[in-house]
Amino acid sequence: MQTLADLLNTIPAIDPAAMSRAQRHIDGLLKPVGSLGRLEALAIQLAGMPGLNGIPHVGKKAVLVMCADHGVWEEGVAISPKEVTAIQAENMTRGTTGVCVLAAQAGANVHVVDVGIDSAEPIPGLINMRVARGSGNIASAPAMSRRQAEKLLLDVICYTRELAKNGVTLFGVGELGMANTTPAAAIVSTITGRDPEEVVGIGANLPTDKLANKIDVVRRAITLNQPNPQDGIDVLAKVGGFDLVGIAGVMLGAASCGLPVLLDGFLSYAAALAACQMSPAIKPYLIPSHLSVEKGARIALSHLGLEPYLNMDMRLGEGSGAALAMPIIEAACAIYNNMGELAASNIVLPGNTTSDLNS
């Protein structure tokens, strides 16, 4: 069995030759050069991913939802009862939550993973990777040990790679956990170097009069735990949570197979920041779905160098944005594979210097 270090060191590089071929092919399609904008760039990005063998396409689709509770809930940083995590996880097994409906619309399977729900017994229908019944309270202790973080990362990476072996070529990430925007903000603040006040938002409708306490909790967590911003695992272990570790694991697992992974909202941006610290080579495999309205979203995305495809004023989480954006990926593949070519119609457009569309 490969170790975590082995997997982090074997992320395949994007294939520039495949991307160049894709660029020439797209420039020769029945349209003015560049007229499909970011859809063209997306198709070229996909062509460079080794797991797709140079041809943008979508096989099976999967959204992996990491579910966990957080000890920092005790600090009054969320208004929802902690029990809602377990209740909503069970609802996901029935297909009635937002991500389940949107994933079904997109033709994607939802994998609901218990990585740290605070319930006495495992919840039927969930994939059980539970590390503990919730993470530590980051305002007074680390979220988890480094060993716990590394083991969960490896477990999720292996699960993701197994899905890829079974035909999944497009992954989406999601999460579920009351109070989880607090550790996410702590991660974003730590890695970007921005003050907590700049990145802490209202999460799931936290009253504005409670926002100062949430900012203070994040600041205390960082001061107490002293996470190393250059060490993604250290950041996740000290001020993160099991759901955030799980999301990072999906990203690393998909990238290790040379396959794309759709980000969701603020939680996924935070996990991506940590994952990119572990292995910068995964960045070209990350596709941003939508711009979360959570306060620190733009700061995190700017640090990642990513521009979302959608701006829908969404902040549900769960993987809802990732599921919603899956048809955009399929559209990029469709134009690449199904549009006709200028040469076949004897059309010559000014500025089109494509000489060999199939080279």
Swiss-Prot record:
Homodimer. It is an enzyme of class 2 (transferase). This is Nicotinate-nucleotide--dimethylbenzimidazole phosphoribosyltransferase. HAMAP family: CobT. Catalyzes the synthesis of alpha-ribazole-5'-phosphate from nicotinate mononucleotide (NAMN) and 5,6-dimethylbenzimidazole (DMB). NCBIfam families: cobT_DBIPRT, PRK00105.1. Its EC number is 2.4.2.21. SUPFAM superfamilies: Nicotinate mononucleotide:5,6-dimethylbenzimidazole phosphoribosyltransferase (CobT) (SSF52733). GO terms for biological process: cobalamin biosynthetic process.
